[in-house]
Swiss-Prot record:
NCBIfam families: PRK11469.1 (NF008546)
Keywords: Cell inner membrane, Cell membrane, Ion transport, Manganese, Membrane, Transmembrane, Transmembrane helix, Transport
Protein name, UniProt field: Putative manganese efflux pump MntP
Gene name in the database record: mntP
GO cellular component: plasma membrane
Main subcellular location of this protein, as a coarse class: membrane
Length: 190
């Protein structure tokens, strides 16, 4: 996987966290830069670790599916992308019922884990490709940190408008990456 594909994957993986952070930011009284950076760091670290876990699981199973590796990567990315699109379409607007000034660590960590499960599944798929998993995981973590930080700060203004569309866009990008992997492996474009 080349640098551009890695960066696009990292950006796509950060869309769940961005959408969640927008909702978290929308539910805060006045999100500060400190709170946004704290949230971004929590989301980024967790999002960077989950593809490493998935990659380790994929490596353990790789000898059994080497002949189908491109189909596995495509299938996982397609399913995850479709799931993100469906969840984005179903997602309701962010709730503004009560507005704390700060979210607790465990709430943010649990939200980060929930939004990073797709990165773990992507890590499984990446085990079947020629990628530097550490670089990819760091790119995913850095992108997620940036996007979650921005999401908190933008949440107050964009929550009702952008939240669901960010997730839909992330799903479309994942399906595109999966299709690109399949087309490249099958040699359909030369």
């Amino acid at each position: 996987m080349n640098l551009y594909a890695t960066l696009i994957l990292a950006f796509a993986m950060s869309m769940d966290a961005f959408a969640a952070a927008i909702c978290k930011g929308a539910s805060l009284r006045r999100p500060t830069l400190k709170e946004a950076l704290r949230t971004g760091l929590i989301f980024g670290v967790i999002e960077a670790l989950t593809p490493l876990v998935g990659w380790a699981i994929g490596i353990a199973a790789s000898q059994y599916v080497m002949a189908w590796d491109h189909w596995v990567a495509f299938g996982l990315l397609f399913i995850l992308g479709a799931r993100m699109i469906v969840e984005g379409i179903r997602k309701k607007e962010c709730s503004l019922e009560d507005a704390p000034s700060r979210h607790g660590f465990w709430l943010l960590a649990c939200t980060a884990v929930a939004t990073s499960l797709d990165a773990m599944a992507v890590g499984v798929g990446l085990a079947f490709l020629q990628v530097n998993i550490v670089t990819t995981a760091l790119a995913i973590g850095a992108s997620t940190m940036i996007m979650a930080t921005m999401g908190i700060l933008l949440g107050r203004f964009l929550g009702p408008v952008m939240g669901k569309w960010a997730e839909i866009f992330g799903g479309v990008v994942l399906i595109g990456i999966g299709s690109s992997i399949l087309v490249e492996h099958l040699g359909l474009l030369g």
